């Protein structure tokens, strides 16, 4: 049947498809296209199937697209929207053969994601959740699709409410990376906090990427990263009184998922790395810990969490 009960026949020139594009450091670009521009209009014979399928393969669920989609009837001012609560391969699809339009989504299938699962008699399988909403325009929220997105994101409010008291509001965080280019020190932290003392600031985040670059290809091995941790802790200790005086909480930024090509872990502990087709998955100068490998988790627990606790 028709996805919009407000239109007759093929709902010509009034169905809009909303998706959200994404890539590294440029997440969240809303893309709106008409059903006609996506060639989601029926043929004269009503037998040819047309579909627009999109999604992501792997463990970065917002690479390419957000797991979100919406159809808007612009004449009626109504939006049907869906979001997947998913952190693995997923797909969504707008499908049309006749006057009706179907909107589906979930785990990536055999065609799109090279994945399938056989459920034997007596077995069960639980899929990730999908959050659905339908709404009309709302003056307070602006456009209809904005209001639909607001309704979808409010689904997670219950998880926010269950968080610690310190996370019941959105803290104002300052990342000093572009101020010191990853080489924080007691002196420049003092200068930063002096410069923002008239502002409300909750967290100052230290990024030691500059020191990381000096030993870059080996630093991410987390044995040599010990020195980065010690360096960061030393800066924090030196600046502790300044943080306390201005009631600002310090934080340290680390990326623990990869190793550099000159680190001994890169070549000596391939058993901890992600593999594909029997070989270690390797990019230009990095390899990646297999976060499903208990030995990799134990290694990181010791080298990162253990050293931070010290």
Question: Model segments located where?
Answer:
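Polysaccharide-binding surfaces and accessory modules of carbohydrate-active proteins
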Residues: 1-97, 113-115
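Acidic/aromatic-lined carbohydrate-recognition and catalytic surfaces
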Residues: 12, 213-267, 274
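Active-site beta-loop-alpha junctions enriched in small/polar residues
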Residues: 85-87, 132, 174-179, 208-211, ...
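Short, structured beta-strand/loop micro-motifs enriched in basic residues and often containing a Trp
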Residues: 101-111
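Short Pro-Gly-centered flexible turn/kink motifs
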Residues: 117-136
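Catalytic domains of carbohydrate-active enzymes, especially glycoside hydrolases
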Residues: 120, 188-213, 310
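Short, well-ordered coil/turn segments that N-cap beta-strands
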Residues: 166-172, 200-202, 246-250
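Active-site-adjacent "subsite" loops/lids of carbohydrate-active enzymes
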Residues: 166-171, 178-185, 252, 256-309
